[in-house]
Curated annotation (Swiss-Prot):
Annotated source species: Vibrio cholerae serotype O1 (strain ATCC 39315 / El Tor Inaba N16961)
Lineage of the organism: Bacteria, Pseudomonadati, Pseudomonadota, Gammaproteobacteria, Vibrionales
Pfam families assigned to the protein according to its UniProt record, in alphabetical order: CcmE
Sites where the protein binds heme: 128, 132
Assigned keywords, A-Z: Cell inner membrane, Cell membrane, Cytochrome c-type biogenesis, Heme, Iron, Membrane, Metal-binding, Signal-anchor, Transmembrane, Transmembrane helix
Record protein name field: Cytochrome c-type biogenesis protein CcmE
Amino acid sequence: MNPRRKKRLGVVLAILFGLSATIGLIIYALNQNMDLFYTPTELVYGKEGKKPEIGQRLRIGGMVVEGSVKRDPNSLKVSFDLHDVGPSITVTYDGILPDLFREGQGIVAQGVLVEPTKIEAFEVLAKHDENYMPPEIAEAMKKTHAPLQYSQEQKQGSDQ
């Protein structure tokens, strides 16, 4: 190989190495910032056959269970249970809760799964009013909780 070809080969290899390193870093960054959305039922039973792993970042939406809010009197730590129509999960949060946060209201929490049914949240968002439901919660609840289907025998039995 003559010196000109060696130099050209070196430049091409350097460009390919830089390009592959850039693509690898972009994919790594996207994977680190991807937060999957779950309802409490999907978190407990799995979503499309897969359960989230401990340490995974995720978003979870549901209703705050009445009587489940526990506040630490010496700090801003708060713990509460979240449910949809299935099992409930525990969310812990260290910070100031939104003004609209209260028991029986819908919220979306973003955090890390620390136990199979416990999330350590770093952000809690409350819904706007009693009629509002974030589109992703409504869609997830529609998929997970199909309306009850009654057979003809069941329908006839209820008429008697």
